[in-house]
Amino acid sequence: MKDLSLTLENLDEAFPSEFTQEQLAKAKTIFLKKLSEDAHCFYQGKIQTVAKAPVVGFNWFNVWYTPGVSKVSTKIRDNNDCSFELSNRGNLVAVVSDSTRVLGDGDCTPPGGLGVMEGKAFLMKYLGGVDGVALCIDSRDKDGRHNPDKIIDFVKMCQYSFGAVNLEDISQPNCFKVLDVLREECEIPVWHDDAQGTACVTLAGVINALKLAGKKISDVRIVLYGAGASNTTIARLLITDGADPAKMVLFDTKGALHSGRDDIKADARFYRKWELCEHTNPTHILTMDDAMKGADILISLSTPGPDVIKGEWVKSMADRSIVFACANPVPEIYPYAAKEAGAYIVATGRGDFPNQVNNSIGFPGILKGALMVRARKITDNMAIAAAHSLAEYAEKRGIHIDDIVPNMEEAAVFPYEAADVAMQAIADGVARVTLTREEAFQKAKKDIEHARCLTRSLMDKGFIDMPPADMIRKALDFAIGQVKG
């Protein structure tokens, strides 16, 4: 055991050396949850409002507020597009959730999603130079049922204060209707990160994993375990980017998706799943045992693990198999177990394991790119462009089986990705503003550097306290004690 650094970079070495791989994985999960709870309590959340304009003297309040600000109001009244230039709207994202599917914890009640939504805004700012506001709402109707129309109405009413909307942690099937309606009826881009963001980064991982495995996307057999918002969107983007739907099988809680699933066909709310029933699994494979035999890729976004994905399934896969076990907060199978079962490349959604396939490397750059050109929507082409941008960036700096996509520490990836997304928005005809790629790249780079410098300055000057070492030590001791029993 070594002393744990404040950066947590030597976390594995801070646990007893006699811990097995399984004990270590369990201990890290317990530690991170305990430290998260204590740190959130210590800081009282993660986000605050900081002024971006100077207070040269109190007379300037007559400029920033009344009477001077009246001119701003009337100018926006006469041309609503001026709101993007005369306010922070052009760089502001609403992070909207009804908290009905928070990570793997289910319905956490409206305020229960605040930790995740603030976290989203936190990452947007530091990684993408984008301001975010957490908005957790109650979507229940008078009968107590969660009604997607309540979310739709809320977003449509508040869209005029924001440059984009990030939907988060909305349970299915409501999430499908909410996204599809808002994408068409809002004047600003609406992005569902659980679906589109996860799909974008997963596609990036698949692109580079296939390069390392020496396989083509059009040739491989793909199994998707779980058929929620994430995996259904992943399937759609994979097919759009060249995967063969006839070589693809998806599973939900009732079994494999295929054209004989009358239960899905009969429920109009699950129209996205039915589309996949019609186009995938033409031979009506019914079981995971059969689907996994000879499969090249497994993408699992289902129930938090471990032991949700069986080692026997992985053993039956093709040579140089690829396993993405991306449930949060615990993957369906731990990486060490998947490797022991013969997987060539393993990815999870967690940053403390190799190959973090997590939307944290996607949404900051994607939203920044959309905002810079004032896009009206984020198209599937823009998401696919972001995936290829991430894969290309990683390949240029070098990839290997434990490093297939960029990570959050690679600051340069975000302006690179943002610029590619902006260019695709222009190509798709959804941009209000035209920039060159270099202009987009430089603007994103400047804004991201500014956001990081601001945070570091607040830390250096003591306006943001460092985490107490004792708090970290207590969380570590707690985790070790829980595992040792």
Placement of each model-derived feature along the sequence:
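N-terminal ligand-binding/catalytic initiation module
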Residues: 2-188, 424, 451-485
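Glycine-rich phosphate/diphosphate-binding loop of Rossmann-like nucleotide-binding domains
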Residues: 103, 111-128, 192, 200-303
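General beta-strand structural signal in soluble alpha/beta enzymes
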Residues: 134, 166-169, 190-193, 250, ...
